[in-house]
Protein backbone atom coordinates (compact mmCIF):
# COMPACT_ATOMS: atom_id res chain seq x y z
CA UNK A 1 0.00 0.00 0.00
CA UNK A 2 1.34 3.43 -0.98
CA UNK A 3 1.34 5.61 2.12
CA UNK A 4 2.91 8.59 0.35
CA UNK A 5 1.11 11.83 1.10
CA UNK A 6 -0.87 13.22 -1.84
CA UNK A 7 0.40 16.78 -2.10
CA UNK A 8 -1.55 17.80 -5.20
CA UNK A 9 -4.54 20.09 -4.72
CA UNK A 10 -7.32 20.84 -7.18
CA UNK A 11 -8.18 24.48 -6.48
CA UNK A 12 -6.70 27.60 -4.95
CA UNK A 13 -9.36 27.30 -2.24
CA UNK A 14 -7.86 23.98 -1.17
CA UNK A 15 -4.40 25.57 -1.11
CA UNK A 16 -5.81 28.18 1.26
CA UNK A 17 -7.31 25.47 3.46
CA UNK A 18 -3.94 23.71 3.68
CA UNK A 19 -2.16 26.96 4.47
CA UNK A 20 -4.61 27.63 7.30
CA UNK A 21 -4.09 24.11 8.63
CA UNK A 22 -0.29 24.16 8.47
CA UNK A 23 0.64 27.66 9.59
CA UNK A 24 0.57 29.13 13.09
CA UNK A 25 -2.45 31.38 13.45
CA UNK A 26 -0.43 34.60 13.56
CA UNK A 27 1.49 33.62 10.42
CA UNK A 28 -1.63 32.60 8.50
CA UNK A 29 -3.41 35.81 9.48
CA UNK A 30 -0.69 37.80 7.71
CA UNK A 31 -1.68 36.08 4.44
CA UNK A 32 -5.35 37.01 4.63
CA UNK A 33 -5.04 40.44 6.20
CA UNK A 34 -6.80 43.36 4.56
CA UNK A 35 -7.52 46.89 5.69
CA UNK A 36 -10.39 47.92 7.95
CA UNK A 37 -13.68 46.06 7.28
CA UNK A 38 -12.35 44.18 4.25
CA UNK A 39 -14.84 45.66 1.76
CA UNK A 40 -12.29 45.91 -1.02
CA UNK A 41 -10.63 42.52 -0.56
CA UNK A 42 -14.07 40.89 -0.65
CA UNK A 43 -15.10 42.82 -3.77
CA UNK A 44 -11.84 41.88 -5.50
CA UNK A 45 -12.82 38.21 -5.37
CA UNK A 46 -16.60 38.31 -5.59
CA UNK A 47 -16.76 40.75 -8.51
CA UNK A 48 -15.40 38.09 -10.87
CA UNK A 49 -18.51 35.98 -10.20
CA UNK A 50 -20.67 38.80 -11.56
CA UNK A 51 -19.04 38.40 -14.98
CA UNK A 52 -20.28 35.70 -17.32
CA UNK A 53 -19.11 34.07 -20.54
CA UNK A 54 -20.61 33.92 -24.05
CA UNK A 55 -19.49 30.42 -25.15
CA UNK A 56 -19.76 28.72 -28.54
CA UNK A 57 -21.23 25.25 -28.92
CA UNK A 58 -19.32 24.02 -32.02
CA UNK A 59 -15.91 24.80 -33.47
CA UNK A 60 -13.69 24.75 -30.40
CA UNK A 61 -10.01 25.00 -31.39
CA UNK A 62 -7.95 21.84 -31.03
CA UNK A 63 -5.10 23.72 -29.36
CA UNK A 64 -5.03 26.92 -27.35
CA UNK A 65 -2.08 29.32 -27.06
CA UNK A 66 -1.52 31.18 -23.79
CA UNK A 67 1.93 32.65 -24.40
CA UNK A 68 2.46 36.40 -24.26
CA UNK A 69 5.03 38.99 -23.24
CA UNK A 70 5.12 41.33 -20.26
CA UNK A 71 7.66 44.14 -20.07
CA UNK A 72 9.78 42.46 -22.73
CA UNK A 73 9.75 39.01 -21.14
CA UNK A 74 8.27 36.01 -22.93
CA UNK A 75 5.97 34.08 -20.59
CA UNK A 76 4.04 30.87 -21.17
CA UNK A 77 0.76 32.08 -19.69
CA UNK A 78 -0.68 35.53 -18.86
CA UNK A 79 0.04 35.18 -15.15
CA UNK A 80 3.04 36.56 -13.27
CA UNK A 81 4.01 36.54 -9.62
CA UNK A 82 3.16 39.74 -7.78
CA UNK A 83 5.72 41.10 -5.30
CA UNK A 84 4.76 40.39 -1.68
CA UNK A 85 6.80 41.13 1.41
CA UNK A 86 8.55 38.73 3.82
CA UNK A 87 7.59 35.32 2.43
CA UNK A 88 8.78 33.62 5.61
CA UNK A 89 5.80 31.27 5.59
CA UNK A 90 8.28 28.72 4.19
CA UNK A 91 12.05 28.49 4.76
CA UNK A 92 12.81 28.76 1.03
CA UNK A 93 10.56 31.80 0.64
CA UNK A 94 11.05 33.83 -2.51
CA UNK A 95 13.68 31.44 -3.87
CA UNK A 96 11.10 28.63 -3.94
CA UNK A 97 8.59 30.94 -5.63
CA UNK A 98 11.14 32.03 -8.22
CA UNK A 99 12.01 28.42 -9.00
CA UNK A 100 8.34 27.58 -9.41
CA UNK A 101 7.76 30.53 -11.72
CA UNK A 102 10.78 29.55 -13.82
CA UNK A 103 9.59 25.94 -14.00
CA UNK A 104 6.24 27.14 -15.34
CA UNK A 105 7.74 29.68 -17.71
CA UNK A 106 6.72 32.94 -16.13
CA UNK A 107 8.14 36.05 -14.48
CA UNK A 108 8.19 37.17 -10.87
CA UNK A 109 8.00 40.49 -9.08
CA UNK A 110 10.34 40.57 -6.07
CA UNK A 111 9.41 42.87 -3.20
CA UNK A 112 11.94 45.23 -1.70
CA UNK A 113 10.55 43.84 1.59
CA UNK A 114 11.38 40.27 0.57
CA UNK A 115 13.06 37.89 3.00
CA UNK A 116 15.64 36.75 0.43
CA UNK A 117 18.27 38.94 -1.28
CA UNK A 118 17.69 39.65 -4.93
CA UNK A 119 20.96 38.01 -5.93
CA UNK A 120 19.71 34.63 -4.67
CA UNK A 121 16.38 35.01 -6.44
CA UNK A 122 17.77 36.09 -9.82
CA UNK A 123 20.13 33.10 -9.68
CA UNK A 124 17.15 30.73 -10.10
CA UNK A 125 14.92 32.84 -12.37
CA UNK A 126 16.20 35.36 -14.90
CA UNK A 127 12.79 37.01 -15.33
CA UNK A 128 12.71 39.11 -12.17
CA UNK A 129 11.07 42.51 -11.86
CA UNK A 130 12.29 44.31 -8.73
CA UNK A 131 9.65 46.21 -6.77
CA UNK A 132 10.36 49.46 -4.95
CA UNK A 133 8.41 51.45 -2.39
CA UNK A 134 9.11 55.16 -2.00
CA UNK A 135 11.25 54.73 1.09
CA UNK A 136 14.08 57.06 2.00
CA UNK A 137 15.58 59.84 -0.09
CA UNK A 138 16.30 59.71 -3.82
CA UNK A 139 19.85 58.50 -3.27
CA UNK A 140 18.65 55.53 -1.20
CA UNK A 141 15.95 54.65 -3.72
CA UNK A 142 18.38 54.87 -6.60
CA UNK A 143 20.90 52.70 -4.74
CA UNK A 144 18.29 49.93 -4.40
CA UNK A 145 17.40 50.19 -8.07
CA UNK A 146 21.06 50.07 -9.10
CA UNK A 147 21.67 47.02 -6.91
CA UNK A 148 18.71 45.30 -8.57
CA UNK A 149 20.00 46.17 -12.03
CA UNK A 150 23.47 44.85 -11.17
CA UNK A 151 21.93 41.63 -9.87
CA UNK A 152 20.13 41.06 -13.15
CA UNK A 153 16.60 42.40 -12.61
CA UNK A 154 14.98 42.96 -16.00
CA UNK A 155 12.33 45.45 -14.92
CA UNK A 156 11.29 47.80 -12.13
CA UNK A 157 7.90 47.90 -10.38
CA UNK A 158 7.13 51.01 -8.35
CA UNK A 159 4.29 50.73 -5.82
CA UNK A 160 2.95 54.01 -4.49
CA UNK A 161 -0.66 53.27 -3.49
CA UNK A 162 -0.07 52.43 0.18
CA UNK A 163 -2.01 54.69 2.56
CA UNK A 164 -1.09 53.05 5.91
CA UNK A 165 -4.70 52.24 6.81
CA UNK A 166 -5.25 51.61 10.50
CA UNK A 167 -7.44 49.01 12.14
CA UNK A 168 -8.63 45.64 10.88
CA UNK A 169 -11.94 44.29 12.13
CA UNK A 170 -10.44 40.81 12.55
CA UNK A 171 -7.24 42.14 14.11
CA UNK A 172 -3.83 42.89 12.66
CA UNK A 173 -1.35 40.02 12.29
CA UNK A 174 1.07 39.77 15.20
CA UNK A 175 4.49 39.96 13.57
CA UNK A 176 7.36 40.21 16.08
CA UNK A 177 10.02 42.85 15.60
CA UNK A 178 12.74 40.23 15.83
CA UNK A 179 12.99 36.49 16.28
CA UNK A 180 15.14 36.34 19.40
CA UNK A 181 15.04 33.73 22.17
CA UNK A 182 12.34 35.59 24.12
CA UNK A 183 10.11 35.82 21.05
CA UNK A 184 10.61 32.16 20.19
CA UNK A 185 9.67 31.11 23.72
CA UNK A 186 6.56 33.31 23.56
CA UNK A 187 5.49 31.88 20.20
CA UNK A 188 6.39 28.27 21.00
CA UNK A 189 2.93 27.22 22.31
CA UNK A 190 1.37 28.40 19.05
CA UNK A 191 4.11 26.86 16.90
CA UNK A 192 3.86 23.49 18.68
CA UNK A 193 0.34 23.10 17.34
CA UNK A 194 1.81 23.15 13.81
CA UNK A 195 4.56 20.49 13.96
CA UNK A 196 5.12 20.29 10.21
CA UNK A 197 5.81 24.02 9.93
CA UNK A 198 8.04 23.86 13.01
CA UNK A 199 9.91 20.87 11.58
CA UNK A 200 10.52 22.67 8.26
CA UNK A 201 12.14 25.56 10.06
CA UNK A 202 13.92 23.31 12.54
CA UNK A 203 15.75 21.57 9.70
CA UNK A 204 17.30 24.88 8.67
CA UNK A 205 18.72 25.51 12.16
CA UNK A 206 17.62 29.13 11.92
CA UNK A 207 14.42 31.02 12.82
CA UNK A 208 12.26 32.83 10.23
CA UNK A 209 14.06 35.84 8.83
CA UNK A 210 12.26 39.04 9.76
CA UNK A 211 14.84 41.28 8.13
CA UNK A 212 14.58 42.86 4.68
CA UNK A 213 17.94 42.31 2.97
CA UNK A 214 17.05 44.24 -0.19
CA UNK A 215 16.79 47.48 1.78
CA UNK A 216 20.53 47.43 2.45
CA UNK A 217 23.71 46.93 0.48
CA UNK A 218 24.56 43.60 -1.10
CA UNK A 219 25.86 41.14 1.49
CA UNK A 220 24.19 42.90 4.42
CA UNK A 221 21.35 41.41 6.46
CA UNK A 222 19.30 44.55 5.98
CA UNK A 223 17.22 46.31 8.64
CA UNK A 224 14.48 44.60 10.67
CA UNK A 225 11.09 44.66 8.96
CA UNK A 226 9.52 47.17 11.34
CA UNK A 227 12.48 49.51 11.20
CA UNK A 228 12.18 49.65 7.42
CA UNK A 229 8.41 49.97 7.67
CA UNK A 230 8.77 52.89 10.06
CA UNK A 231 11.16 54.65 7.69
CA UNK A 232 8.68 54.08 4.88
CA UNK A 233 5.89 55.67 6.95
CA UNK A 234 8.13 58.65 7.60
CA UNK A 235 9.09 59.22 3.97
CA UNK A 236 7.09 61.93 2.16
CA UNK A 237 4.93 60.36 -0.58
CA UNK A 238 6.30 60.73 -4.12
CA UNK A 239 5.12 63.30 -6.63
CA UNK A 240 4.65 62.71 -10.33
CA UNK A 241 7.96 64.51 -10.79
CA UNK A 242 9.57 61.88 -8.55
CA UNK A 243 8.10 59.08 -10.68
CA UNK A 244 9.35 60.73 -13.87
CA UNK A 245 12.80 61.17 -12.28
CA UNK A 246 13.07 57.49 -11.31
CA UNK A 247 11.85 56.48 -14.75
CA UNK A 248 14.73 58.44 -16.25
CA UNK A 249 17.22 56.69 -13.96
CA UNK A 250 16.04 53.17 -14.81
CA UNK A 251 17.21 51.89 -18.19
CA UNK A 252 14.59 49.24 -18.83
CA UNK A 253 10.90 48.36 -18.48
CA UNK A 254 9.12 50.26 -15.71
CA UNK A 255 5.73 49.53 -14.15
CA UNK A 256 3.62 51.72 -11.88
CA UNK A 257 1.54 49.46 -9.64
CA UNK A 258 -1.65 50.53 -7.90
CA UNK A 259 -3.42 52.55 -10.59
CA UNK A 260 -7.22 52.60 -10.19
CA UNK A 261 -8.17 55.90 -11.90
CA UNK A 262 -8.09 56.93 -15.55
CA UNK A 263 -6.51 60.31 -14.83
CA UNK A 264 -3.70 58.62 -12.88
CA UNK A 265 -3.21 56.15 -15.73
CA UNK A 266 -2.79 59.04 -18.15
CA UNK A 267 -0.33 60.77 -15.82
CA UNK A 268 1.64 57.53 -15.63
CA UNK A 269 1.83 57.46 -19.43
CA UNK A 270 3.07 61.06 -19.40
CA UNK A 271 5.75 60.05 -16.86
CA UNK A 272 7.07 57.49 -19.33
CA UNK A 273 6.12 54.19 -17.71
CA UNK A 274 6.13 50.99 -19.77
CA UNK A 275 3.27 49.34 -17.90
CA UNK A 276 0.68 49.90 -15.21
CA UNK A 277 -1.05 47.46 -12.91
CA UNK A 278 -4.69 48.18 -12.15
CA UNK A 279 -4.68 47.35 -8.47
CA UNK A 280 -5.84 48.29 -4.98
CA UNK A 281 -2.98 46.49 -3.21
CA UNK A 282 -5.04 43.37 -2.74
CA UNK A 283 -7.46 45.18 -0.46
CA UNK A 284 -4.62 46.15 1.86
CA UNK A 285 -4.88 49.81 1.00
CA UNK A 286 -7.81 52.24 1.24
CA UNK A 287 -10.84 50.13 2.09
CA UNK A 288 -13.82 51.00 -0.07
CA UNK A 289 -11.73 51.24 -3.24
CA UNK A 290 -13.51 49.36 -6.05
CA UNK A 291 -12.37 45.93 -7.15
CA UNK A 292 -9.58 46.15 -9.70
CA UNK A 293 -11.60 44.26 -12.33
CA UNK A 294 -14.34 46.93 -12.11
CA UNK A 295 -11.85 49.69 -12.96
CA UNK A 296 -9.95 47.73 -15.62
CA UNK A 297 -12.15 48.17 -18.74
CA UNK A 298 -12.21 51.97 -18.68
CA UNK A 299 -8.49 52.26 -17.92
CA UNK A 300 -7.57 49.75 -20.63
CA UNK A 301 -9.67 51.65 -23.14
CA UNK A 302 -8.03 54.95 -22.18
CA UNK A 303 -4.34 53.95 -22.23
CA UNK A 304 -4.12 50.34 -23.42
CA UNK A 305 -2.73 51.37 -26.79
CA UNK A 306 0.12 53.30 -25.12
CA UNK A 307 1.28 51.07 -22.24
CA UNK A 308 0.87 47.48 -21.13
CA UNK A 309 -2.05 47.18 -18.72
CA UNK A 310 -2.00 44.43 -16.10
CA UNK A 311 -4.41 43.63 -13.29
CA UNK A 312 -3.92 42.27 -9.82
CA UNK A 313 -6.46 41.53 -7.13
CA UNK A 314 -8.87 38.65 -6.63
CA UNK A 315 -7.51 36.09 -9.10
CA UNK A 316 -8.43 32.60 -7.88
CA UNK A 317 -9.21 30.70 -11.11
CA UNK A 318 -8.05 30.51 -14.69
CA UNK A 319 -11.47 31.78 -15.74
CA UNK A 320 -10.73 34.96 -13.76
CA UNK A 321 -7.59 35.42 -15.83
CA UNK A 322 -9.54 35.04 -19.08
CA UNK A 323 -12.12 37.58 -17.93
CA UNK A 324 -9.38 40.10 -17.14
CA UNK A 325 -7.57 39.57 -20.45
CA UNK A 326 -10.80 39.86 -22.44
CA UNK A 327 -11.56 43.16 -20.70
CA UNK A 328 -8.19 44.66 -21.56
CA UNK A 329 -5.43 43.24 -19.37
CA UNK A 330 -2.27 41.95 -21.01
CA UNK A 331 -1.74 39.64 -18.04
CA UNK A 332 -2.58 39.36 -14.35
CA UNK A 333 -0.49 39.28 -11.21
CA UNK A 334 -1.26 36.89 -8.35
CA UNK A 335 -0.45 37.31 -4.66
CA UNK A 336 -2.36 35.43 -1.97
CA UNK A 337 -2.99 32.47 -4.30
CA UNK A 338 0.69 31.59 -4.66
CA UNK A 339 1.46 32.40 -1.02
CA UNK A 340 -1.10 29.79 0.01
CA UNK A 341 0.55 27.33 -2.35
CA UNK A 342 3.96 28.17 -0.88
CA UNK A 343 2.69 27.69 2.66
CA UNK A 344 0.98 24.42 1.73
CA UNK A 345 3.71 22.67 -0.24
CA UNK A 346 6.67 24.98 -0.90
CA UNK A 347 7.88 25.23 -4.50
CA UNK A 348 5.63 22.37 -5.60
CA UNK A 349 2.64 24.19 -4.14
CA UNK A 350 3.37 27.33 -6.15
CA UNK A 351 3.76 25.22 -9.29
CA UNK A 352 0.43 23.58 -8.45
CA UNK A 353 -1.29 26.98 -8.24
CA UNK A 354 0.13 28.02 -11.62
CA UNK A 355 -1.00 24.70 -13.11
CA UNK A 356 -4.52 25.27 -11.77
CA UNK A 357 -4.66 28.67 -13.43
CA UNK A 358 -3.23 27.32 -16.68
CA UNK A 359 -5.87 24.58 -16.79
CA UNK A 360 -8.66 27.05 -16.14
CA UNK A 361 -7.41 29.41 -18.84
CA UNK A 362 -7.27 26.56 -21.35
CA UNK A 363 -10.78 25.40 -20.49
CA UNK A 364 -12.24 28.90 -20.81
CA UNK A 365 -10.51 29.50 -24.15
CA UNK A 366 -11.90 26.22 -25.45
CA UNK A 367 -15.43 27.08 -24.37
CA UNK A 368 -15.22 30.52 -25.94
CA UNK A 369 -13.88 29.08 -29.19
CA UNK A 370 -10.66 31.07 -28.96
CA UNK A 371 -7.36 29.58 -30.08
CA UNK A 372 -5.27 32.23 -28.30
CA UNK A 373 -5.55 34.63 -25.40
CA UNK A 374 -4.79 37.33 -27.97
CA UNK A 375 -8.10 36.55 -29.69
CA UNK A 376 -10.17 37.39 -26.62
CA UNK A 377 -12.47 40.42 -26.91
CA UNK A 378 -14.85 42.17 -24.51
CA UNK A 379 -17.81 40.59 -26.31
CA UNK A 380 -16.71 37.23 -24.89
CA UNK A 381 -17.71 38.47 -21.44
CA UNK A 382 -21.17 39.24 -20.11
CA UNK A 383 -20.74 42.45 -18.13
CA UNK A 384 -23.84 43.41 -16.13
CA UNK A 385 -25.09 46.96 -16.20
CA UNK A 386 -23.42 49.09 -13.55
CA UNK A 387 -20.49 46.71 -13.10
CA UNK A 388 -17.64 48.97 -14.20
CA UNK A 389 -16.29 51.93 -12.25
CA UNK A 390 -14.99 54.89 -14.24
CA UNK A 391 -12.83 56.74 -11.73
CA UNK A 392 -10.99 59.90 -12.69
CA UNK A 393 -12.99 60.47 -15.87
CA UNK A 394 -14.15 64.06 -16.48
CA UNK A 395 -17.94 64.39 -16.67
CA UNK A 396 -19.37 64.58 -20.16
CA UNK A 397 -19.90 68.08 -21.50
CA UNK A 398 -23.30 69.42 -20.55
CA UNK A 399 -23.94 66.77 -17.89
From Swiss-Prot:
The gene is mftD. Its cofactor is FMN. GO terms for biological process: mycofactocin biosynthetic process. This is Pre-mycofactocin synthase. It catalyses: 3-amino-5-[(4-hydroxyphenyl)methyl]-4,4-dimethyl-2-pyrrolidin-2-one + O2 + H2O = pre-mycofactocin + H2O2 + NH4(+). CDD domains: alpha_hydroxyacid_oxid_FMN. Disruption phenotype: Cells lacking this gene lose the ability to utilize ethanol as the sole growth substrate. They are unable to produce PMFT(H2) and glycosylated (methyl)MFT(H2), and accumulate AHDP and glycosylated AHDP. The keyword tRNA processing does not apply. Its EC number is 1.4.3.26. It comes from the Bacteria. PANTHER family: 2-HYDROXYACID OXIDASE 1, S -2-HYDROXY-ACID OXIDASE-RELATED. The active site is at 281 (proton acceptor). A 2-oxocarboxylate binds at residues 133, 168.
Amino acid sequence: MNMARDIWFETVAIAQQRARKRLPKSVYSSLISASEKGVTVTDNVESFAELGFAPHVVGAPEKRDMATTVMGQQISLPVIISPTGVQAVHPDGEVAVARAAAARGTAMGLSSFASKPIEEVVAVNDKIFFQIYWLGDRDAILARAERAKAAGAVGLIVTTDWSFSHGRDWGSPKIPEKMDLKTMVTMMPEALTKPRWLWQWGKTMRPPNLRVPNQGARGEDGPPFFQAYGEWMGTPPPTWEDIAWLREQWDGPFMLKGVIRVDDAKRAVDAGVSAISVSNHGGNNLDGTPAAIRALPVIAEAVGDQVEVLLDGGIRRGSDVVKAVALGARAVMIGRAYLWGLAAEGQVGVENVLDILRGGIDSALMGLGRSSIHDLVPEDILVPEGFTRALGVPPASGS
